[in-house]
Amino acid sequence: MSTIYTIACTDLHNLLARMKPATAKASDRLPVLERVRLSVDAFTMTAMATDRYRLFMDSAPVVSEEGTEDGERIARVFTLPATAADDFKRLGFAKAEHEHAKVEVTAAEVTVSTGTARLTYPALGADYPQTGTLMAGALEKITEGGAVETATAYNADYLAD
């Protein structure tokens, strides 16, 4: 089964380009952190990247070609390598203001295509870090005026053998 999304080429390029500084450098130990986590819910694609010390998030509008029976959209999470931003720039996504890309997500791969180009990226073979629970805890501490030390706990938990 695949899920297909449509997003403006410039939005897709800009999302990944803004995430690239927060992704980890190439590493045999942590290849998952070289990728950008993308989640689609309702009409928004949210990108998130971390190198264990920084966390970047941003979003852009997206149209899903698949929905549930009651009209709500199906949430889907997938990743793309941070280097996809370079691929998109090379193909002119950064300047294609009126062109849209189709993003097709399957269990094995993510395919990004336009009228003139098609890029396929393998699916991530490992779980992306569960930053949602860490962020929820951090936001709770911040609203209570407390200090946030989630980065240390996250690094210890994630890097534990």
State the predicted function of each range.
Residues 1-161:
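DNA polymerase processivity clamps
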